[in-house]
Amino acid sequence: MLVAAAAERNKDPILHVLRQYLDPAQRGVRVLEVASGSGQHAAHFARAFPLAEWQPSDVDQRCLDSIAATTQAQGLTNVKAPLHLDVTWGWEHWGGILPQSLDLLLCINMAHVSPLRCTEGLFRAAGHLLKPRALLITYGPYAINGKISPQSNVDFDLMLRCRNPEWGLRDTALLEDLGKASGLLLERMVDMPANNKCLIFRKN
């Protein structure tokens, strides 16, 4: 099983945000997590919302194996087998998920460590797969209207772009535009620890 230190640090702050939008007592809530990584988030959140159906996914086979091992080791029955999913694929190829069937699409720490086309694919799919009034929630470090702060995020962005020119902190203004193109409005921006943010998009 993979263990990501960042996931251990941020899983509770993110859960605090999710609890403001999901009811643990509600049955049948369908959640898709894109780029689930180690599976630590899926396991933590599925335990907190035991009546919801959690669908983890990733493009990396090592992550898929870790997700399966993590959720099985914890005996979680509300987590489905992880999907092999490349976020750049058309939504029709997202594991048979039906249009307007998801209550939440969750994406943690993907946008800044992947090419922009991945974020574009995420928003396109969200426009098709989310139910009306359902949510896309993303988490990570962002530029805000062209400005990156504090200096640690500026340095992080530079490091990412040196590692891969297609990586880097995405601007919330760009994400707002991508959202609007898919019928999603940025409803709220939540300040998180370590200079990260949760962005809450709601489907019209």
From Swiss-Prot:
Keyword Acetylation attributed: yes
Xref: Pfam families: DUF938 (PF06080)
Domain of life: Eukaryota
InterPro entries: DUF938, SAM-dependent_MTases_sf
UniProt keywords, alphabetically: Acetylation, Phosphoprotein
Record PANTHER family: METHYLTRANSFERASE-LIKE 26 (PTHR20974:SF2), UPF0585 PROTEIN CG18661 (PTHR20974)
Family under the similarity heading: Belongs to the UPF0585 family.
Name of this chain's protein: Methyltransferase-like 26
